[in-house]
């Protein structure tokens, strides 16, 4: 009988029991799927059935007679939305869940019990002797938010790579793709009301970003997603139960937007403005006192709510220098009008206007707002506590501060969850940030709720890995730095703390090297030895 470690499920289920015997596939199977809200569960199973047949040739047909079914998907209304039960015996595979997401995650687990080529979608003719270990699994995520953020403002990767990233997330039951689409160095999403955002803001005169001895290379570089592209990617993610959270970083980190429309976004429109060619933090922020800038932000949000039919929009809020506001007469006048002497409160005021505007929209277009934790430096009482704080710098303290104010929070600590940083001290590591201390082990061993009072824990909605791309220009480097650290964060988001063990994880994740190779994904091979 196999051990749980030999079965190698990642993330580790909440409860796993290995039993005697095996389920033999054969060449054909019958399945019974419980109807639910039209065909929503059946559509999840049809996708699995197609993948299984393409990879193995095994045909699955439908039956309404449970006695004839060898795979059964049965509704269990008592289970939480993403929870499932999976029972594999000698005779049948039985899955219970209350929502399509639970059935999807159960089928992801079922694929992990199979040879890795099924998960990879790679065909094989050698399936006649296939079997599954007999197991009983009761599983549910620890946190509702299990996220990954990709910065494409600095470097653009394109539609195909984004789908690969979504595939990586789906394998490990992650459910939030935070898409950082705007930066000082580039604006990556088509906004029809403001075409110059992509005509001008999506392009710059250097692929590499200047830093220290690294100088601009003069190469015309950029790219953006059309609204057609966005809709295609959203549809792709929805099939994998991943919500996409667009981030439009305003009013800071906005030099690309300012370069596109300096006449109403710049604090100093008389000066030259261009898409930034450097790393670091630009002082060229949006003039929040210009009514046309406020209108711009509202109309960008209008298009975002049409493109992303999910619950959240991220408006940034980090690293917003106030230097140009301090020199701008309009901004100084506005600060006086709102009764403050803290220029950071201009940012909070700006967000308050946008939050109030979103509240006037039809119910299906209203969105909850997320901000980086620097907004806590301003008078957040203006905003209210019905916002979410994404804690990255001084993350543990910031998350507690937000929770004490009654705000939901997501942990994305710079150390160790910034997985764009070097993952080892090996000389073969690609050029990136960090000193190689954000190893897989360091990422895995971070405990999200360590020293958090029980009364505050309900405000902690989950965890997120972040990937900033100042140094990363190629998909192969992106993937190398992501894998397998992404899986370590995924397990923190899914698996109960008492079930987590790094040595066990390391043995399980090594078996995914075959999956990565079959998918053609780059990864940290030194970790898999």
Residue ranges: model-predicted function:
Residues 257-263, 267, 274-387, 392-401, ...:
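Active-site neighborhood of glycoside hydrolase catalytic domains
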Residues 31, 99, 148, 169, ...:
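Conserved, mostly hydrophobic/aromatic
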Residues 5-143, 477, 489-527:
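Contiguous, structured surface segment used for ligand recognition
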Residues 368-374, 381-387, 393-529:
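Flexible, acidic glycine-rich loops studded with aromatic residues
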Residues 39-40, 156-158, 184-190, 251-257, ...:
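Flexible loop/turn segments at secondary-structure boundaries
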Residues 79-299, 303-312, 464-469:
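Feature activates predominantly on carbohydrate-active enzymes
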């Amino acid at each position: 009988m196999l051990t749980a470690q030999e079965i190698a499920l990642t993330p580790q289920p909440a409860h796993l029991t290995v039993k005697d015997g095996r389920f033999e596939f054969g060449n054909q199977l019958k399945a019974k799927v419980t109807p639910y809200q039209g065909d929503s569960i059946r559509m999840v199973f049809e996708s699995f059935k197609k993948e299984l047949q393409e990879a193995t040739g095994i045909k699955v047909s439908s039956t309404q007679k449970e006695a004839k079914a060898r795979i059964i998907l049965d509704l269990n209304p008592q289970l939480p939305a993403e929870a499932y039960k999976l029972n594999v015996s000698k005779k049948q595979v039985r899955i219970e869940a209350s929502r399509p997401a639970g059935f999807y995650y159960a089928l992801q687990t079922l694929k992990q019990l199979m040879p890795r080529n099924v998960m990879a979608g790679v065909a094989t003719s050698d399936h006649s002797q296939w079997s599954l270990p007999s197991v009983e699994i009761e599983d549910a995520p620890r946190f509702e938010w299990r996220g990954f953020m990709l910065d494409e403002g600095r470097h653009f990767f394109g539609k195909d790579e984004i789908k690969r990233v979504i595939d990586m997330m789906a394998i490990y039951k992650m459910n939030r793709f935070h898409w950082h689409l705007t930066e000082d160095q580039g604006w990556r999403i088509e906004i029809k009301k403001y075409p110059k955002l992509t005509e001008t803001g999506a392009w710059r005169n250097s692929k590499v970003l200047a830093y220290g001895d690294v100088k601009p290379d003069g190469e015309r570089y950029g790219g953006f997603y059309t609204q057609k592209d966005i809709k295609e990617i959203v549809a792709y993610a929805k099939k994998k139960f991943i919500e996409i959270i667009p981030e439009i970083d305003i009013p800071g980190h906005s030099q690309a937007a300012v370069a596109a429309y300096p006449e109403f976004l710049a604090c100093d429109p008389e000066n030259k403005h261009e898409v930034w060619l450097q790393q670091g933090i630009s002082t060229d922020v949006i003039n929040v006192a210009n009514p046309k800038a406020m209108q711009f932000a509202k109309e960008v949000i209008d298009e975002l709510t049409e493109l992303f039919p999910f619950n959240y929009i991220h408006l940034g809020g980090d690293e917003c220098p106030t230097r140009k506001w301090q020199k701008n007469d309009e901004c100084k006048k506005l600060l006086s009008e709102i009764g403050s002497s803290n220029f950071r409160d201009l940012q909070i005021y700006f967000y308050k206007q946008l939050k109030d505007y979103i509240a006037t929209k039809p119910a299906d277009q209203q969105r909850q707002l997320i901000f980086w934790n620097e907004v806590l430096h301003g008078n957040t009482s203006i905003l209210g506590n019905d916002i979410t704080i994404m804690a990255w710098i001084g993350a543990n303290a910031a998350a507690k501060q937000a929770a004490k104010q009654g705000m939901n929070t997501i942990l994305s600590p710079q150390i160790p969850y910034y997985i764009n940083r070097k993952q080892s001290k090996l000389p073969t590591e690609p050029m990136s940030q960090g000193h190689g201390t954000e190893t897989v082990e360091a990422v895995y061993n971070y405990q999200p709720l360590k020293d958090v009072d029980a009364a505050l824990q309900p405000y902690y909605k989950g965890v997120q890995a972040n990937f900033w791309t100042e140094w990363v220009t190629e998909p192969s480097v992106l993937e190398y730095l992501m894998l397998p650290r992404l899986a370590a964060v995924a397990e923190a988001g899914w698996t109960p703390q008492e079930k987590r063990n790094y040595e066990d994880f390391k043995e399980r994740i090594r078996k995914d090297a075959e999956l990565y190779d079959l998918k053609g994904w780059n990864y940290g091979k030194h970790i898999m030895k």
